[in-house]
Curated annotation (Swiss-Prot):
Signal peptide: none annotated. It comes from Escherichia coli O6:H1 (strain CFT073 / ATCC 700928 / UPEC). Keywords: Aminoacyl-tRNA synthetase, ATP-binding, Cytoplasm, Ligase, Nucleotide-binding, Protein biosynthesis. Its EC number is 6.1.1.14. SUPFAM superfamilies: HD-domain/PDEase-like (SSF109604). Tetramer of two alpha and two beta subunits. The gene is glyS. It is found in: Cytoplasm. This is Glycine--tRNA ligase beta subunit. One of its GO terms (cellular component) is cytosol. PROSITE patterns: AA_TRNA_LIGASE_II_GLYAB. HAMAP family: Gly_tRNA_synth_beta. GO terms for molecular function: arginine-tRNA ligase activity; ATP binding; glycine-tRNA ligase activity. GO terms for biological process: arginyl-tRNA aminoacylation; glycyl-tRNA aminoacylation.
Length: 689
């Protein structure tokens, strides 16, 4: 069967840059699934994406589906005919479904009986006939949150469509896709190359688009070119470009023919905190800031034009003129804000609502102030500095700078606090209170910052759960999942002596009578323990290890972490599987018994050597391991408990637990309970698979 290259290109108006990659990848994944479902043999499916096009190129696509043999088994012969040998209704209905009569059916005979059988040779459908619907279906499944409709058409897509190219080898596949008749016309760059041209063969793509249309259709190629050229441009001015992955992706999605240029701004603007300047350059203008080798911002930026100009200096000057007013605004806001102290913004917080049932930002500030001080006392941080940081924590939200450049919240609080002469750990805490902002982000760097960050997040968790607005499905408007994980990370990775129980109770207490959920404390703790599950799964821990620890519901995050590491290590021991099985057996025996057990094992009642030996070792280990448990040395404790494998195995091999003698039975059950309690001091080992 011959093979050909297939090309589909959808020419559109400018596509959303932040969604371009996902649209192209989904298009490729959807179409690959369509090919596979249809049984069409094919080679690599390569996707292309530029601001005004989505395209796929499929190598070695078979020209038709393979022929196939189909078999459909019908009713058993006994049910297919009546006593007179006439076909039953079931047989006739089956035959109609197969497009035959009963007398045309074959018979299938096996050692289990005889059935009617329909067998047919089905010729594979041509690829040309299948492709239009496959393309349309793949486009319909794209993850587009908001569709557009244009003109008088009822067609909906992410952006208006102007061209549809469908080529199988050198042949146009006739189809109407998204209201457009397919042909071999492709549009080039808006301002360079040929605005429109025809493509003779699918194999010519994307080279013909580069040569004649001045468009680099390969997304990764554009991105790599921007990165390499920007790094070289920064090197030429003695700096390093801030090429964040997200901005690189966005810029690569905005240009069809990237040309990297370098511009500058006035050095006087460097007196403004660099974060505000960078926010303007990256967020508003999509420029790449440039830093010196010592990490200081340089008065330069790198940007990407979408055209090769005979006079690039004109483009550079234009971009410098565009960015200057934004930097001047930042300078003005910075100087204006510093004319009063950060603390002077406190009264204005009373005018901003945090949440209708939970009060204003000033109310939240008061709670954070008290909670940060309480946390500081628990972890040995400076209480006065923590309460001061809590008082100032939201004041920068009322400044001109943060109002205009919202992503500078926190960092501007730090700069203004330093200007006011606040303690350095207080100033740093104002910036770091929102950390970690995302997975893998840095944690607060000092104890005061840790106290403030935990207080801010716990206040939100307690308040939102307290009014019954916990996350549902994918909806999490208050980012409670991120807040919970942030609290856990800070406590675990900083090894802080905090208990979720008392921490949540204190956060709830500070709300007074505002909360309506009577179970708020348990709900918050359960939610946070659930985030532990997700965290440790991401870290590579097995689900049953997590469940074994969760079963004990330890509410000290650092303690939870120690148990996780202990159980994970325990699983590597030779005795682990046998002891997990023994714990499961003990758990089942105890669960089935409704007898009242003794407080201790009666040594005089023990009879068999195996139970005497096991009872002695349980007593010895109970006394020996008490300080281990008190100090959180769970790994050492489980290593010691692993020594019980041999006496436990011997006990179950030689000793009957559920004997008729009640005193003996209860004594043995009591011993098993004491054995299980030792393991439960760490985790429920019986849950390990």
């Amino acid at each position: 069967m011959s093979e050909k290259t297939f090309l589909v290109e959808i020419g559109t108006e400018e596509l959303p840059p932040k969604a371009l990659r996902s649209l192209a990848e989904s298009f490729a994944a959807n179409f690959t699934a369509e090919l596979d479902n249809a049984g069409l043999a094919h080679g690599t499916v390569q996707w292309f994406a530029a601001p005004r096009r989505l395209a796929l190129k499929v190598a070695n696509l078979a020209e038709a589906q393979p022929d196939r043999e189909i078999e459909k088994r019908g009713p058993a012969i006994a049910q297919a005919f009546d006593a007179e040998g006439k076909p039953s209704k079931a047989a006739e209905g089956w035959a109609r479904g197969c497009g035959i009569t009963v007398d045309q059916a074959e018979r299938l005979t096996t050692d289990k009986g005889e059935w009617l059988l329909y067998r047919a040779h089905v010729k594979g459908e041509s690829t040309e006939a299948l492709l239009p619907n496959m393309v349309a279906t793949s486009l319909a499944k794209l993850p587009i949150p908001k569709l557009m409709r244009w003109g008088a058409s009822d067609v909906h897509f992410v952006r208006p469509v102007h061209t549809v190219t469908l080529l199988l080898g050198d042949k146009v596949i006739p189809a109407t896709i998204l209201g457009i008749q397919s042909d071999r016309v492709i549009r080039g760059h808006r301002f360079m190359g040929e605005p429109e041209f025809t493509i003779d063969n699918a194999d010519q793509y994307p080279e013909i688009l580069r040569e004649r249309g001045k468009v680099i259709a390969d997304y990764e190629e554009r991105k790599a070119k921007i990165k390499a050229d920007a790094e070289e441009a920064a090197r030429k001015i003695g700096g390093n470009a801030d090429l964040s992955e997200s901005l690189l992706e966005e810029v690569a999605s905005l240009v069809e023919w990237p040309v990297v240029l370098t511009a500058k701004f006035e050095e006087k603007f460097l007196a403004v905190p660099s974060e505000a300047l960078v926010y303007t350059m990256k967020g508003d203008q999509k420029y790449f800031p440039v830093y010196a080798n010592d990490g200081k911002l340089l008065p330069n930026f790198i940007f990407v034009a979408n055209i090769e100009s005979k006079d690039p200096q004109q483009i550079i000057s234009g971009n410098e003129k565009v960015v200057r007013p934004r930097l001047a605004d930042a300078e003005f806001f910075f100087n204006t804000d510093r004319k009063k102290r950060l603390e002077d913004n406190l009264p204005r917080l009373q005018t901003v609502l945090f949440q209708q049932q939970l009060g204003t930002l000033r109310d939240k500030t008061d709670r954070i102030q008290a909670l940060a001080g309480w946390i500081a006392e628990q972890i040995g941080a400076d209480v006065n500095h923590a309460t001061r940081a809590g008082l100032l924590s939201k004041c920068d939200l009322m400044t001109n700078m943060v109002f205009e450049f919202t992503d500078t919240q926190g960092v501007m609080g730090m700069h203004y606090a330093r200007h006011d002469g606040e303690a350095e750990d207080v100033a740093v805490a104002l910036n770091e209170q929102y950390q970690p902002r995302f997975a893998g982000d840095d944690l607060p760097s000092n104890p005061v910052a840790c106290a403030l960050a935990i207080a801010d997040k716990m206040d939100t968790l307690a308040g939102i759960f307290g009014i019954g607005q916990h996350p549902k499905g994918d909806k999490d408007p208050f980012a409670l999942r991120r807040a919970a994980l942030g609290v856990l990370r800070i406590i675990v990775e900083k090894n802080l002596n905090l208990d979720l129980q008392t921490l949540t109770e204190e956060a709830v207490r500070l709300y007074g009578d505002k909360l309506t959920n009577a179970n708020v404390v348990d709900d918050v703790i359960d939610f946070m323990l659930g985030r532990f599950r997700a965290w440790y799964q991401d870290e590579g821990y097995t689900v049953d290890t997590i469940q074994a620890v969760l079963a004990r519901r330890p509410t000290r995050p650092a303690d939870f972490d120690a148990r996780m590491k202990a159980v994970s290590h325990f699983r590597t021991l030779e005795a682990a599987a046998a002891l997990a099985a023994a714990n499961k057996r003990v758990s089942n025996i105890l669960a089935k018994s409704d007898e009242v057990l003794s407080d201790r094992v009666n040594a005089s009642t023990l009879k068999e050597p195996e139970e005497i030996k096991l009872a002695m070792q349980v007593v010895v280990l109970r006394d020996k391991l008490e300080p281990y448990f008190a100090e959180g040395r769970y790994q050492d404790a489980l290593v010691e408990l692993a020594e019980l494998r041999e006496p436990v195995d011997a006990f179950f091999d030689k000793v009957m637990v559920m004997v008729d003698d009640k005193e003996l039975r209860i004594n043995r059950l009591t011993m098993l309970e004491k054995l299980r309690e030792l393991f439960l001091r760490v985790a429920d080992i019986s849950l390990l698979q």
